Amino acid sequence: MTSISLNLIMAFSLALAGVLIYRSHLMSTLLCLEGMMLSLFILMALLISHFHMLSVSMAPLILLVFSACEAGVGLALLVKTSTDYGNDYVQNLNLLQC
């Protein structure tokens, strides 16, 4: 395993640990999710170029598109939550309320 792959796997695991540790605020959770998606994108692009897999060469771009959609929905949820409640606590996102 090269040092670049190891660094990207470490970045992914640190972002995952950030999601698990800083889950009280929505903004920090969204930033950690973006870090996870970015490290997955770079790792996937490097692995595809290293192994010359042309059949799945569009997969990193598709992952990047889904990451952008996730960021847009997350920011819309953040704006809606902060205008309704005045803060960005995840505990305000109770899906059982009607």
From Swiss-Prot:
EC number: 7.1.1.2
Major localization class: mitochondrion
A cellular component term, taken from the record's GO annotations: mitochondrial inner membrane
Bilayer topology annotation: Multi-pass membrane protein
Localization per Swiss-Prot or TrEMBL: Mitochondrion inner membrane
Main enzyme class: translocase
Catalytic activity, reaction form: a ubiquinone + NADH + 5 H(+)(in) = a ubiquinol + NAD(+) + 4 H(+)(out)
GO molecular function: NADH dehydrogenase (ubiquinone) activity
Alphabetic keyword roster: Electron transport, Membrane, Mitochondrion, Mitochondrion inner membrane, NAD, Respiratory chain, Translocase, Transmembrane, Transmembrane helix, Transport, Ubiquinone
Keyword NAD: yes
UniProt xrefs under InterPro entries: NADH_UbQ_OxRdtase_chain4L/K, NUOK/Mnh_C1-like
Keyword Membrane in annotation: yes
GO biological process: ATP synthesis coupled electron transport
Residues spanning the membrane: 1-21, 28-48, 59-79
One protein family per Pfam: Oxidored_q2
Subunit field text: Core subunit of respiratory chain NADH dehydrogenase (Complex I) which is composed of 45 different subunits.
Family, similarity comment: Belongs to the complex I subunit 4L family.
Protein's job: Core subunit of the mitochondrial membrane respiratory chain NADH dehydrogenase (Complex I) which catalyzes electron transfer from NADH through the respiratory chain, using ubiquinone as an electron acceptor. Part of the enzyme membrane arm which is embedded in the lipid bilayer and involved in proton translocation.
Descriptive protein name: NADH-ubiquinone oxidoreductase chain 4L
Organism of origin: Vombatus ursinus
Lineage: Eukaryota, Metazoa, Chordata, Craniata, Vertebrata
Gene: MT-ND4L
